[in-house]
């Protein structure tokens, strides 16, 4: 199943608002100039930008990624445990700024946009206990967050997906959930319903040798198209991490193949670079313009 602009979830990372000197606070107000929401744009480790969440949204990203550790009862956002700081949390960087933006934009992440921002939450600490804390946090934003009840989705402005140390059994057992499960390519034929596993993500280098130098081998191109077709047939979206991300012809070549295959989310740390590439080369964005 191919997701349309209407149904595409966004992954979001926000700005720190408390004590972290290296992280600028996110602005609740929408940007002054119109920004085109980019269906495929995913901000990898979004919290590492100067203005978490805000920078991604200023470049039209519809999916952002936050690494989360449960420390002293807080859902702290950082790549490594030693970098966690009190008050720099999922709520302060993402949920609160997104709720403010939701209110400022009349119920949408981007004014006039009817899609859902995907917030990819990568659990770094113990899966079950951290997920329980995430679940509690998401439930505090019922008007903002997508939920699933008895297998039926009620889409809202932000859709959370759990990656990293994912407690599948605990998530599957919930009658009402406020997050989806991020699967792996080994889950493509698992039979897990798309309402539980809306996304399948994996490491590019574990499945492909091509990194953009020369033409893509035909066997690998066929493999990529088959993966995406299989995922879409089950209603799953597709994302790869560890794709080339240094500006240059190799990155452009890989991004071109990802678009041609219908990969749903393109992973990057270069917000401006991916924005410019998608606006110039993604047929979806050209149709929307």
Predicted regions and their residues:
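Secretory targeting and sorting signals
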Residues: 1-29
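A structural motif detector for short, solvent-exposed N-terminal "entry" segments of globular domains
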Residues: 49-54
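Catalytic cores of phosphodiester-bond hydrolases, prominently lipid phosphodiesterases
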Residues: 32-38, 55-62, 69-289
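Short N-terminal segments immediately surrounding and downstream of signal-peptide cleavage
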Residues: 29-48
